């Protein structure tokens, strides 16, 4: 069951990241919508969007909506770090957000949001990585995690988060392919 919940493993909070690793993470953030597009380009798309990756999980469609919600939050958190306009993350309840009714609608609006957001977000992060390296240590306190999270950790976390949910969507596609 843990392999279905964390198909690529859980995020390692204790890892230190080199500039090269962070550049690679930004490329993964930039490319995530393209990888999602490849998964959506299937004859089994409708079945995949309704499939769950494990019992009781979100469907692929709900995962796409969640990624849009979560990655908008992450973009804003990165902006707060870079603009020095906040010192604490504004938490949000992802499960409550998934119950607001919009997760029932087609994935397409969230997909389009992810396309634009990831383009802008990756440019923001690449620009930050070109500047003063001390910005990577700048952080926000995250009350849900009980710790401060640096910009470097946010970059790595959300590269992981995108890969994590792409793996969930791949599991949904595998499930849809096994229906026949």
Please name every model-derived segment.
Residues 1-8, 12-14, 47-95, 126, ...:
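Short, contiguous alpha-helical
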Residues 11-28:
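Short, charged, low-complexity loops and linkers
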Residues 22, 29, 33, 56-57, ...:
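Generic structural signal for well-ordered secondary structure
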Residues 24, 28-31, 62, 66, ...:
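Alpha-helical initiation/capping and key positions within long helical/coiled-coil segments
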Residues 27-41, 97-137, 153:
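Acidic/histidine-rich alpha-helical segments that form the ligand environment
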């Amino acid at each position: 069951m843990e392999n279905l919940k964390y198909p690529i493993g859980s995020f390692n909070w204790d890892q230190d990241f080199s500039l090269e690793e962070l550049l690679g993470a930004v490329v993964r953030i930039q490319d995530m919508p393209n990888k999602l597009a490849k998964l959506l380009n299937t004859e089994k798309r409708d079945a995949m969007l309704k499939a769950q990756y494990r019992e009781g999980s979100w469907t692929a469609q709900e995962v796409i909506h969640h990624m849009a919600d979560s990655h908008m939050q992450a973009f804003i958190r990165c902006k707060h770090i870079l603009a020095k306009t906040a010192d604490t993350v504004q938490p949000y309840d992802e499960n409550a957000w998934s119950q607001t009714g919009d997760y029932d609608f087609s994935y397409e609006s969230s997909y389009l949001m992810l396309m634009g957001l990831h383009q802008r977000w990756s440019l923001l992060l690449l620009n930050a990585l070109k500047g003063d390296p001390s910005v990577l240590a700048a952080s926000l306190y995250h009350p849900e995690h009980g710790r401060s999270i640096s910009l470097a950790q946010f970059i790595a976390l959300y590269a992981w988060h995108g890969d994590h949910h792409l793996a969930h969507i791949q599991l949904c596609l595998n499930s849809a392919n096994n229906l026949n």
